[in-house]
């Protein structure tokens, strides 16, 4: 090989390496952009810290046929001469089945079911007033219902701020609660429709004196149905002994947490169309990164596998916890300790029970 040909070969080799590096760099940049959120979750233990643990994690005592007097005493509280009035307040979207289960479970203990809905989603998409249009389904609770409508705002040019709209609706709920007649000393339950307190928890807080003025209610987390239970628990719902400063909020408000107080059944819908609606409607709708995320066949497969609808990694703060929760949720064959109304109407709510993962399109 002549010197000139060797020089040409070296130049070609350098050019090839440069081109290869350029291609690899471009692919890497595209991959980072496409998977930025997933990468962020993967390295969360490096840049984020977990919220402070609750300082007061209250044991929760309950068994059938134990008197409320004994239960109050076990918690260090005393029995009231009469129960508190209870106001159950939710901002409603489209979870009609879970609303029915919630109200049937809590009906004996609740004075007023306070429900606020809007004609747009948090993301500014027009939506029906699902509760108003299906109110005849809830005639069993008609005398206890206080219903309000929030005039939503349509999104324009992608500038909508879903968390700001959500905060506005929570402020509107404060006004609706006062219209519903809530008074100082009443018990206020704050939570989303799918965060359902157990009836005995509400009864306990209704009948006992000495309870904390504000406490969070720990709830077991379920995904798609009661067949898939997640390891971690939900602490967002709260119970308040109402006073003039009480605000309807879904954020952390106290360091007191009552153990094992209910069920959080996330994306527990009957129809695939309801999954599609919520994926586009709720505050984290930016997680729908591709159109194929909304394909019915994909959603159905994910429901039956116990996978994540948004192809997200778990939100964890240590690599140990992150790797522990990778993969599909384990399937459970147990339908013990689920809402009684679901078991009493098992044919109607088969989709929430083990073996019922198949959904209709809707």
Question: Model-derived features: where do they sit?
Answer:
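Conserved catalytic core of nucleotide-sugar-dependent glycosyltransferases
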Residues: 195-311
